[in-house]
Swiss-Prot record:
Induction: Expression is positively regulated by the azaterrilone A cluster-specific transcription factor tazR. Its EC number is 2.3.2.-. One of its GO terms (molecular function) is transferase activity. InterPro entries: CAT-like_dom_sf. Keywords: Transferase. This is Probable acetyltransferase tazD. It comes from Aspergillus terreus (strain NIH 2624 / FGSC A1156). It is an enzyme of class 2 (transferase).
Length: 453
């Protein structure tokens, strides 16, 4: 169902089933001041002009308001099963900006900020002057990894224009035309599942069984510990090493993603207890649906939308690294099918039902190294913006999610010719030293298996 103006300036639509499913997962941790799977995306940048913190903050706030006009869904709220957007008055716009754009002191680091983030009814932004970095934080039902980085790009572009005094006149009241529809609306999926959709959904649901008895990392610390903050261990390959990795992957007819995925499997087996290393490894096959959507929904104008999907996929411990990599390559190349797309609504409906029925949690809880990739991040965030003599250079980008479980997530992307490996973990279950060691092993495994080390 499309957006409808229910009162002057108030636009509403039903929450999509995929949004509802992801929101249900995130909301369960609100009682402890956290939000599982909330997304953080950021960029470190420099400007060719020196600005006082006060002036930069003023430019950022102006850019933030203009950014909302271009991507109004960042200011949507949800109550019950309804998503709402209110065209703001000047006072409401100022109040929203003050609530959602946070300027931190020089001593605040991105690592500490992310570990302390709390749920918000809106997408929020954080300026870290000490790192020359901006971070966007959003509930996962609002966007996905690709969309989050596209939003980073859009904000930096708007900021560069604001600094370069290239502002545009904003006609509040017509931004509703850019509100994001749900994936079910974009794919024109029926409310009532057909027999074909039910069968496709059944096949996707079957993959959940692969999580049972799967290998995971050996536990450390207190098994009964409550989750704490989300931290990360990061490793960046040099441009020369990245080029060598890409060439070696091409020679073996596998993608970088498939190679890193096979390395995540190898890392999980290495980090498992010795008596668990013969178990199969199960992880998520994640796909961006954006390339499969009709324009304009396939483009960055609809970055503030949840357009992703996936299913579980196992590989046995008996296979070699290259056998696993080739199996992942085949799966990534064939995973998005007509059946997969047409069951997106019903699959989410079934998962919501499973969660609401309160199925007992798996014992032991999953603890594998899972994987998520945004590929070439330069396709999402430009390394350089120029407006009226103002030059904004992006030094680096980053993407991750909040995790409140024993699972870790390897995020990978390339930017400015470098492969970035970003291991996200909860500090209640992993010591920083172990996480740093794990990401080093991951990179070493990748290079060794490709004949580069």
């Amino acid at each position: 169902m499309p957006w409808i103006e229910t009162k002057p300036g108030l636009w509403q639509r039903p929450i999509g089933d995929n949004e509802k499913f992801i929101k249900f997962i995130g909301d369960r941790s609100h009682q402890v001041g956290r939000e599982h799977w909330s997304v953080t995306a950021g960029a470190a940048f420099t400007l060719n002009r020196d600005w006082s913190l006060s002036d930069l903050s003023s430019h950022c706030l102006n850019a933030w308001c203009a950014f909302r006009f271009d991507h109004p869904s960042i200011a949507c709220t949800v109550e019950g099963d309804t998503v709402s957007y209110q065209t703001p008055s000047n006072e409401e716009l100022a109040s929203w900006a003050n609530e959602t754009f946070h300027i931190h002191d020089l001593s605040t680091t991105s690592d500490d900020l992310i570990a302390a983030l709390k749920p918000s009814r809106y997408l929020t932004a954080h300026l870290l002057p000490g790192e020359n970095r901006v971070i966007l934080h959003a509930a996962h039902w609002r966007t996905d990894g690709y969309g989050a980085l596209q939003l980073v790009h859009a904000f930096l572009d708007t900021l560069c224009k604001a600094v370069g005094c290239h502002s545009k006149a904003i006609q509040w009241g017509e931004e509703w035309r850019r509100l994001t529809p749900s994936i079910e609306e974009v794919l024109d999926l029926p409310l009532t599942a057909t027999p074909e959709i039910l069968e496709a959904t059944k096949e996707c649901l079957k993959t959940l069984a692969h999580t049972r008895g799967a290998v995971g990392t050996a536990p450390s610390g207190d098994k009964l510990a409550a989750p704490a903050g989300t931290r990360s261990a990061h490793l960046s390959l040099t441009t020369a090493d990245t080029s060598a990795v890409m060439a070696a992957c091409a020679e073996r007819k596998i993608s970088l993603l498939s190679a890193v995925h096979a390395s995540c499997a190898a890392l999980t087996w290495l980090e498992a207890s010795s008596n668990d290393r013969d178990k199969h490894y199960t992880s998520t096959m994640r796909f961006s649906l954006r390339p499969h959507l009709p324009p304009p929904y396939s483009g960055p104008a609809y970055a503030a939308g949840l357009y992703t999907g996936g299913y579980m996929f196992p590989v046995p411990a008996s296979q070699s690294w290259i056998e696993n990599a080739k199996q992942y390559e085949k799966e990534y190349n064939t995973g998005i099918t007509e059946d997969f797309l047409k069951c997106r609504r019903q699959y989410a409906v079934e998962l919501i039902g499973i969660l609401q029925r309160g199925a007992p949690p798996p014992d032991p809880p999953p603890s594998e190294v899972d994987i998520s990739s945004v590929g070439d991040a330069e396709a999402l965030v430009s390394p350089r913006f120029t407006h009226n003599g103002t030059i904004l250079e992006v030094q680096s980008v980053d993407i991750g999610v909040e995790t409140l479980t024993r699972q870790t997530y390897c995020f990978l992307w390339t930017f400015r010719g470098r492969l970035e490996l970003h291991l996200v973990y909860n500090e209640a279950f992993y010591e920083p030293e172990r996480a740093e060691r794990m990401v080093r092993i991951l990179a070493k495994t990748l290079q060794t298996e490709l004949g580069l080390a």
